[in-house]
């Protein structure tokens, strides 16, 4: 399976140990089960985010296709910039057998959260990182991967909308 960051594991262990001593619960097996559950939720979150990349890209692809088919589309709608939807990093993720298997086995999906996926897409499309990505002369796998790294670092991580969604759903993390 995917390697979870050592710092995250240490934090989870310390949280469980703290809880173990605070509650006065002498059952070490309960603490171990809590740790394993917490780590599993971290894995789920990791895979949810990978799946989110694919879902956001697929949504944009559907939007571009719909615009092409409308009555009297503009030249830009007929010939849109497809760099975002042709991102090689996303294509690699979408074909990753480990990701597909995990998503299928765990039943992970964004299908019930299309409005959230649309909001994430809108946030990305309105970001300076996206504008720079489209203008970048260099077109390579590395620039595609770097785009998504920056999006996660500067747009998704710490985004109030995403944090609110996670706290409301309590499905992951």
Q: How would you label these PLM feature ranges?
A:
Residues 170-172:
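Conserved small/polar residues in nucleotide/adenosyl-binding loops
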Residues 3-162:
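N-terminal, charged low-complexity regulatory/assembly segments
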